Amino acid sequence: MSRLSWKKEHKLLRKPEFDLCYEQGKKLFTKSFILFVLCHGSGPSGVRLGLTVSRKKGPAVVRNRIKRVLRSYFRINQEIFQVRADIIIVPKRALDGKTITYALAEKELLPMVGKINKLSCGGE
């Protein structure tokens, strides 16, 4: 399978997984996003991604565009993560979902990758 695939084991899918990340995860902030990062020493390798986009961001077309751009960023850059972590991304109100681009996501999230890789992840 292609190295650019995004398998099911790289996704946060269930409410308990999201709740655990919200409660115990570390918050990181950018201009347009809030990231909840929960490092773990065991489980699937690499990063698992969860996306939460509120209905306040606009109609389904806009919300799906935001999620599509963010998934694309993580799918293409999945190899630069050096930790095992669950990451939830929540767009802030300042983000205009109609004009979000891959370049904007990369500009804001690339510095966060460095911070995520430096997090203390259970002695790894």
From Swiss-Prot:
Catalytic reaction(s) noted: Endonucleolytic cleavage of RNA, removing 5'-extranucleotides from tRNA precursor
Pfam family, one: Ribonuclease_P
Top-level division of the source organism's lineage: Bacteria
UniProt enzyme class: hydrolase
InterPro entries: Ribosomal_Su5_D2-typ_SF, Ribsml_uS5_D2-typ_fold_subgr, RNase_P
Gene Ontology MF annotations: 3'-tRNA processing endoribonuclease activity; ribonuclease P activity; tRNA binding
SUPFAM superfamilies, sorted: Ribosomal protein S5 domain 2-like
Keywords noted in UniProt: Endonuclease, Hydrolase, Nuclease, RNA-binding, tRNA processing
Keyword Nuclease: yes
Cellular component GO terms held in the UniProt record: ribonuclease P complex
GO biological process: tRNA 5'-leader removal
Enzyme Commission number(s): 3.1.26.5
Family in the record: Belongs to the RnpA family.
NCBIfam families linked to this entry: rnpA
Quaternary organization: Consists of a catalytic RNA component (M1 or rnpB) and a protein subunit.
Function of the protein: RNaseP catalyzes the removal of the 5'-leader sequence from pre-tRNA to produce the mature 5'-terminus. It can also cleave other RNA substrates such as 4.5S RNA. The protein component plays an auxiliary but essential role in vivo by binding to the 5'-leader sequence and broadening the substrate specificity of the ribozyme.
Name recorded for this polypeptide: Ribonuclease P protein component
Organism field: Maridesulfovibrio salexigens (strain ATCC 14822 / DSM 2638 / NCIMB 8403 / VKM B-1763) (Desulfovibrio salexigens)
Gene name, Swiss-Prot/TrEMBL: rnpA
